From Swiss-Prot:
This is Tyrosine--tRNA ligase. CDD domains: S4, TyrRS_core. It is an enzyme of class 6 (ligase). A motif ('HIGH' region) lies at residues 44-53. HAMAP family: Tyr_tRNA_synth_type1.
């Protein structure tokens, strides 16, 4: 479907557009008004966002690219309650101090990925605690709660799924959709914001905000959702077996971040190039046309471009160089490291223990099977002896050894007086 708005055409071609309220009216507004203010919200449940939020961050970048002003709403208030959307059970209530620290961490991450200058399209950060913390309960029930139908609220997926499964839904969580709806109204009053973007699980919350604005006789508001981020196996992205894929470099280094995207399924490469990079669509189509082993080149481009956006050009190039070094048996000094002590080396460390300690394998039994299957290498030499021990001879006067598990996981083992 062709739109008048270049922004809508762009996000549709790249795969961002999932659902939209009154898309014809939004198309008209975006094509006629060059100064639209839009917002995307993030809850503050961790000290960093992970790649599950990457689509929304890219949408912020694209809003700026097309001349619109984005608002980043940090849920300092709503995080105190917890969004029930897509959750099987209630989140633990975080202490206020933790939420405030998380806000600082998320701000630091976002400042590397979108522009917060004072220009026309410069993003602004707001915290909904600034207005939610001051709400008087009786006034809120009378002025806002009266516009919500419990019958209708029970039909939204975030509520219905929990109730159908006979899973507990607290009154605290039930209030979340009222507060998010109120956020949209508040942002319209304060900043003239008329457009909200969120993940597909936020559809009900977005619609509630639009309906509330109508009942309060405000200008027409619009909402758009992006698709749920799933990989080729249908699994929700954002976490791996070894933990979340964080966007903060202090929680996940640029090399591991690069490697995550280098190792995505072949079927995901084209889609991720469209969603997570700034490459022109013609260049992406050329990369999408690569087949078989050539697909690995497209994966390297994907990994490098995504890492540039999150960690900067220098870190992306260092990560790419380290990966090439590891795969081509060259100097692997740029790889992430794991430190052991001289005392451990003197006593000797069973290779099985080291594979487990570094997190390469979830158990010593799995480590044993990896070795038996010729999947483990020390300094690029395959080790198939399950009793193999890492000792001073393994280092041969070098400051580190390279430990490899399979073809895609590599780490350097360093020696220090004390473990870091």
């Amino acid at each position: 479907m062709k739109h008048k708005s270049e922004f809508l055409n762009f996000i549709q071609e790249r795969g961002y557009l999932y659902q939209c309220t009154n898309i014809d009216r939004l198309d008209q507004l975006l094509s006629q008004d060059n100064y639209i203010i839009a917002y995307i919200g993030f809850d503050c449940t961790a000290p960093s966002l992970h790649i599950g939020s990457l689509i929304q961050i890219m949408m912020l970048r694209h809003l700026q690219k097309f001349g619109y002003k984005p608002i980043v709403l940090l849920g300092g208030g709503t995080t105190k309650i917890g969004d029930p959307s897509g959750k099987d059970k209630a989140r633990s209530v975080l202490p206020i101090e933790d939420i405030n620290q998380n806000i600082l961490g998320i701000k630091k991450t976002l400042e590397k990925m979108i522009s917060f200058d004072y220009g026309k399209t410069g993003a602004i950060i707001v915290n909904n605690a600034d207005w939610l913390d001051n709400i008087k309960y009786i006034d809120f029930l009378r002025d806002i709660g009266t516009h919500f139908s419990v019958n209708r609220m029970l039909g939204f997926d975030s509520v219905k799924i929990r109730l159908d499964r006979e899973q507990n839904l607290s009154f605290l969580e039930f209030n979340y959709m009222l507060l998010q709806a109120y956020d949209f109204v508040e942002l319209n009053k304060k900043y003239g914001c008329r457009f909200q973007i969120g993940g597909s699980d936020q559809w009900g919350n977005i619609v509630n905000g639009i309906e509330l604005s109508k009942k309060l006789n405000l200008p027409e508001l619009f909402g758009l959702t992006t698709p749920l981020l799933l990989n080729a196996q249908g699994k929700k992205m954002g976490k791996t077996e070894s933990g979340a894929v964080w966007l903060d470099g202090s929680m996940l280094n640029s090399y591991d971040y690069w490697q995550y995207f280098r190792n995505v399924d072949d079927q995901d490469v084209g889609r991720f190039l469209r969603l997570f990079t700034d490459l022109p669509i013609d260049e992406i189509k050329k990369l999408e046309s690569l087949k078989d082993q050539e697909t690995n080149e497209a994966k390297k481009v994907l990994a490098t471009e995504v890492t540039k956006i999150c960690h900067g050009c220098k870190e992306a190039e260092l990560a790419r160089s380290a990966a090439i070094s590891a795969f081509e048996n060259e100097d692997s000094s740029l790889l992430s490291g794991y430190t052991i002590t001289k005392e451990q080396i003197a006593n000797g460390i069973p290779l099985i223990d080291l594979l487990y300690d570094t997190g390469f394998e979830p158990s010593k039994g799995a480590a044993k099977r990896l070795i038996q299957g010729n999947g483990c290498k020390v300094n690029d030499n395959t080790i198939n002896d399950v009793n193999y021990t890492i000792n001073s001879e393994s280092f041969k006067g070098q400051p580190f050894i390279k430990l490899s598990a399979g073809k895609k996981r590599h780490i350097k083992i360093l020696v220090s007086e004390v473990r870091k």
